[in-house]
Amino acid sequence: TGRSGPRWLCVALVVGRVSIAPAQAARFSTVIIDPGHGGKDKGAYWGGVRESHLNLKVAKELETLLKRRGIRTVMTRRSDVFVSLSRRAQIANGYRHAVFVSIHFNASTNTAIKGAETYYWGSTGRMIAGAIQRRLPARCQVRNRGVRRHGFTVLVQTRCPAVLVECGFISNSRERLRCSTQWYQQTAARAIYDALMACR
């Protein structure tokens, strides 16, 4: 997600909780796709691989799948530009019956750590996060690091169901090579897509 140190050094936290009825997840007609970082915020950088670029590649693959299904998509960025965390949430809050999916890749100073994990804040986000975790790690053949609740700004400030997906650790040399392949990016996007469809 663009850090080698603690997560809270890179993402502002907001106190509070947004309560959303679980039924909303079944009614979404719009998916807000949020490729993490971008522009001056490059995210993690290991072995010549920049997280912000990987995030955008997976996001575009997901957008293609959703559009083929006839689902409206909104990208918080389409190129290597900076978009503030609050602005990302603001974009999401401009749509009704939407879900928000923030796409990231992880990093740690402990280069042995690897795997995929999904974060949520509200109760509906937890359902979507669980659906993603049941698919993405198995299909991408990486360790399942589980579902976690964390107060990232983009999760707390959005009024719709929201999740943040960490697709793998680019600080781990073997996982970084796999994450850099088109196969991995397409497989991760398909797993997220199938999870969203299962929650719809």
Locations of the language-model features?
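Residue-level recognition of conserved structural "scaffold" positions that shape functional pockets
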Residues: A12-V15, G43-W46, E175
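Short glycine-rich His-centered loop
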Residues: S29-G48
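Sec-dependent N-terminal signal peptides of Gram-negative exported proteins
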Residues: S4-A23
